[in-house]
Amino acid sequence: MPTEAHVGDLDGSASSQGGTWKATVTVTVHTSSHSPVAGATVTGSWSIGGTASCTSDSSGRCAVATSAISGGTRSTTFTVTGLTHATMTYKPAANHDPDGDSNGTSIVVRKP
Protein backbone atom coordinates (compact mmCIF):
# COMPACT_ATOMS: atom_id res chain seq x y z
CA MET A 1 0.00 0.00 0.00
CA PRO A 2 1.46 3.40 -0.98
CA THR A 3 2.49 5.66 1.86
CA GLU A 4 3.29 8.90 -0.01
CA ALA A 5 1.19 11.27 -2.09
CA HIS A 6 2.05 14.34 -4.15
CA VAL A 7 0.59 16.77 -6.67
CA GLY A 8 0.72 15.23 -10.15
CA ASP A 9 -0.88 18.08 -12.10
CA LEU A 10 -2.17 21.63 -11.75
CA ASP A 11 -4.45 23.02 -14.46
CA GLY A 12 -5.70 26.59 -14.44
CA SER A 13 -8.64 28.19 -16.18
CA ALA A 14 -10.27 31.60 -16.12
CA SER A 15 -13.75 32.89 -16.87
CA SER A 16 -15.08 36.40 -17.42
CA GLN A 17 -17.87 37.65 -15.20
CA GLY A 18 -18.87 41.10 -16.44
CA GLY A 19 -16.15 43.52 -15.37
CA THR A 20 -14.49 40.89 -13.19
CA TRP A 21 -13.08 37.42 -13.71
CA LYS A 22 -12.62 34.21 -11.76
CA ALA A 23 -9.66 31.80 -11.62
CA THR A 24 -10.07 28.05 -11.08
CA VAL A 25 -7.29 25.52 -10.51
CA THR A 26 -7.84 21.77 -10.77
CA VAL A 27 -5.39 19.75 -8.67
CA THR A 28 -4.58 16.09 -9.31
CA VAL A 29 -3.16 14.06 -6.40
CA HIS A 30 -1.51 10.70 -6.91
CA THR A 31 0.97 8.20 -5.52
CA SER A 32 4.52 7.62 -6.72
CA SER A 33 3.11 5.01 -9.12
CA HIS A 34 0.66 7.63 -10.47
CA SER A 35 -2.43 6.01 -8.99
CA PRO A 36 -5.12 8.57 -8.04
CA VAL A 37 -5.49 9.43 -4.36
CA ALA A 38 -9.01 10.02 -3.04
CA GLY A 39 -9.64 11.85 0.22
CA ALA A 40 -6.55 14.07 0.14
CA THR A 41 -7.11 17.62 1.35
CA VAL A 42 -5.09 20.13 -0.66
CA THR A 43 -4.52 23.62 0.76
CA GLY A 44 -3.03 26.62 -0.95
CA SER A 45 -2.92 30.37 -1.31
CA TRP A 46 -3.67 32.89 -4.04
CA SER A 47 -1.22 35.69 -4.86
CA ILE A 48 -4.14 38.15 -4.89
CA GLY A 49 -4.83 37.18 -1.27
CA GLY A 50 -6.79 34.45 0.38
CA THR A 51 -6.50 30.73 0.87
CA ALA A 52 -8.40 27.79 -0.56
CA SER A 53 -8.71 24.06 -0.03
CA CYS A 54 -10.39 21.08 -1.64
CA THR A 55 -10.61 17.32 -1.13
CA SER A 56 -9.74 14.94 -3.95
CA ASP A 57 -12.37 12.62 -5.41
CA SER A 58 -11.96 9.03 -6.63
CA SER A 59 -10.08 10.28 -9.71
CA GLY A 60 -7.62 12.13 -7.44
CA ARG A 61 -8.92 15.53 -8.56
CA CYS A 62 -10.37 18.54 -6.83
CA ALA A 63 -10.74 22.22 -7.70
CA VAL A 64 -10.26 25.56 -5.97
CA ALA A 65 -11.55 28.90 -7.21
CA THR A 66 -11.22 32.57 -6.44
CA SER A 67 -14.05 34.93 -5.75
CA ALA A 68 -14.46 37.78 -8.27
CA ILE A 69 -11.15 39.36 -9.31
CA SER A 70 -10.94 42.98 -10.45
CA GLY A 71 -10.74 43.41 -14.22
CA GLY A 72 -7.53 45.41 -13.73
CA THR A 73 -5.72 42.37 -12.28
CA ARG A 74 -4.06 40.49 -15.14
CA SER A 75 -3.17 37.23 -13.36
CA THR A 76 -3.05 35.37 -10.08
CA THR A 77 -0.88 32.51 -8.87
CA PHE A 78 -2.14 29.56 -6.86
CA THR A 79 0.51 27.89 -4.69
CA VAL A 80 -0.03 24.56 -2.96
CA THR A 81 0.97 24.96 0.69
CA GLY A 82 -0.04 21.56 2.03
CA LEU A 83 -1.61 18.18 1.41
CA THR A 84 -3.02 15.91 4.10
CA HIS A 85 -4.39 12.38 3.95
CA ALA A 86 -5.48 9.88 6.59
CA THR A 87 -2.91 7.23 5.65
CA MET A 88 -0.35 8.92 3.39
CA THR A 89 2.29 11.57 3.88
CA TYR A 90 2.83 14.48 1.53
CA LYS A 91 6.05 14.47 -0.48
CA PRO A 92 6.24 18.00 -1.98
CA ALA A 93 9.60 17.35 -3.67
CA ALA A 94 7.78 14.89 -5.96
CA ASN A 95 5.25 17.47 -7.20
CA HIS A 96 5.23 17.73 -10.98
CA ASP A 97 3.08 18.60 -13.97
CA PRO A 98 3.17 16.47 -17.14
CA ASP A 99 1.91 19.21 -19.45
CA GLY A 100 4.43 21.79 -18.20
CA ASP A 101 1.99 24.61 -17.43
CA SER A 102 3.14 24.57 -13.79
CA ASN A 103 5.89 23.10 -11.64
CA GLY A 104 3.36 21.02 -9.69
CA THR A 105 3.45 23.43 -6.76
CA SER A 106 2.29 26.74 -8.23
CA ILE A 107 0.49 27.84 -11.38
CA VAL A 108 -0.26 31.23 -12.90
CA VAL A 109 -3.81 31.80 -14.13
CA ARG A 110 -4.16 34.71 -16.56
CA LYS A 111 -7.19 36.91 -17.08
CA PRO A 112 -9.27 35.68 -20.04
Task: Identify the function of each model-found stretch.
Residues 92-112:
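Short beta-strand elements
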Residues 78-98:
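Enriched for extracellular/lumenal, surface-exposed ectodomains of secreted and cell-surface proteins
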Residues 23, 34-46:
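Short, ordered, surface-exposed loop/turn motifs in non-cytosolic proteins
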Residues 52, 62-64, 105:
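Short strand-edge motifs at loop-to-beta-strand transitions and within beta-strands
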Residues 1-24, 30-31, 108-112:
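Beta-strand-rich domain onsets/edges
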Residues 28, 41-53:
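Short amphipathic beta-strand segments in non-cytosolic proteins
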Residues 70-77:
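Short glycine/proline/serine/threonine-rich loop/turn segments at secondary-structure transition edges
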Residues 56-70:
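Glycine-centered loop-to-beta-strand initiation motif
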